[in-house]
Amino acid sequence: MPELPEVEVVRRGLQSHAVGAAIEAVEVLHPRAIRRHILGSEDLIGQLTGQTIASAERRGKYLWLVLEPAGVGLVVHLGMSGQMLVQPPTVDWEKHLRIRLALDSGADLRFVDQRTFGGWSISPLVEVDGTMLPESVAHIARDPMDAAFDLESVVKVLRGKHTEIKRAILDQTVVSGIGNIYADESLWRAKIHGNRIAESLTRPKLRELLTAAHSVMGEALDQGGTSFDALYVNVNGESGYFDRSLSAYGQENLPCPRCGAPIKREKFMNRSSFSCPRCQPTPRARRIA
């Protein structure tokens, strides 16, 4: 699933190429693409047609378009393979095109999703801490790239967590935007093993970790995000290249860029964790009461 940098790349593209355009027509080409919109395709088409895309917004890994004058959010779930592409209408339809918007700018806004895990839904906007969010996103915490991110408050929350630190920073209600890739990269930079218990870490160490998350995601954003295959692209269909700069994630048996020890892979939930056994020693006590 795309993480914060990849979603932000898409958001910026939509802000540049779709915002300000009115929606003239809507085609829903696959029912799974709107399964989260429980009122169905006719309702979604009716709510979208005639609306203007006022802005493209993001919180963590969640993306939405603000529509006016209705004042609602079109929530875009990218899933594992979702793409938002701005195309001239003369370009042939993509094989896995699921939804197409015809804009008054003369362009198409196309939702392409090979694996059909993603989709669109319309949600009312609600105010949370001075920010308007789709109701379905209201429970999501601010992310480290958010100008209003309160580092000390998050440190305090993490200090109260009796769980592995990696699991804690993947909790989108604590801090959003961090997924498996950037969790491993941030933990590597802060020299923390993901199995360390959050409450056992000092406040300075937690600040270091969250600062590392901000830095690594900022660097990834500058490089267009991380693309392991052709499915993670921006609105112009271009892939990012931060995967070439990864220090830990996916680097099993390669030398740690800091100390030279081979990076190791461990099972974590239904995924994998990558870390340096020398820079990030495994904690002695891993059990949680």
From Swiss-Prot:
Enzyme Commission code: 3.2.2.23, 4.2.99.18
InterPro entries in the cross-refs: DNA_glyclase/AP_lyase_DNA-bd, Formamido-pyr_DNA_Glyclase, FPG_cat, MutM-like_N-ter, Ribosomal_uS13-like_H2TH, Znf_DNA_glyclase/AP_lyase, Znf_FPG/IleRS
Protein name (Swiss-Prot/TrEMBL): Formamidopyrimidine-DNA glycosylase
SUPFAM superfamilies per the UniProt record, alphabetical: Glucocorticoid receptor-like (DNA-binding domain) (SSF57716), N-terminal domain of MutM-like DNA repair proteins (SSF81624), S13-like H2TH domain (SSF46946)
Entry keywords, A to Z: DNA damage, DNA repair, DNA-binding, Glycosidase, Hydrolase, Lyase, Metal-binding, Multifunctional enzyme, Zinc, Zinc-finger
Designated gene of the protein: mutM
PROSITE patterns to which the protein is assigned, alphabetical: FPG_CAT (PS51068), ZF_FPG_2 (PS51066)
CDD domains listed in its UniProt record: EcFpg-like_N
Co-factor: note: Binds 1 zinc ion per subunit.
The organism's place on the tree of life at top rank: Bacteria
Active-site residues per Swiss-Prot or TrEMBL entry: P2 (schiff-base intermediate with dna), E3 (proton donor), K61 (proton donor), R271 (proton donor)
Binding locations of DNA: H96, R115, K161
Reactions mediated catalytically: Hydrolysis of DNA containing ring-opened 7-methylguanine residues, releasing 2,6-diamino-4-hydroxy-5-(N-methyl)formamidopyrimidine; 2'-deoxyribonucleotide-(2'-deoxyribose 5'-phosphate)-2'-deoxyribonucleotide-DNA = a 3'-end 2'-deoxyribonucleotide-(2,3-dehydro-2,3-deoxyribose 5'-phosphate)-DNA + a 5'-end 5'-phospho-2'-deoxyribonucleoside-DNA + H(+)
UniProt record similarity statement: Belongs to the FPG family.
Cofactor dependency: Zn(2+)
Zinc finger (FPG-type): 247-281
A Pfam family reported for this protein in Swiss-Prot or TrEMBL: Fapy_DNA_glyco
PANTHER family: FORMAMIDOPYRIMIDINE-DNA GLYCOSYLASE (PTHR22993:SF9)
Assembly information from the UniProt record: Monomer.
Organism in which the protein naturally occurs: Rhodococcus erythropolis (strain PR4 / NBRC 100887)
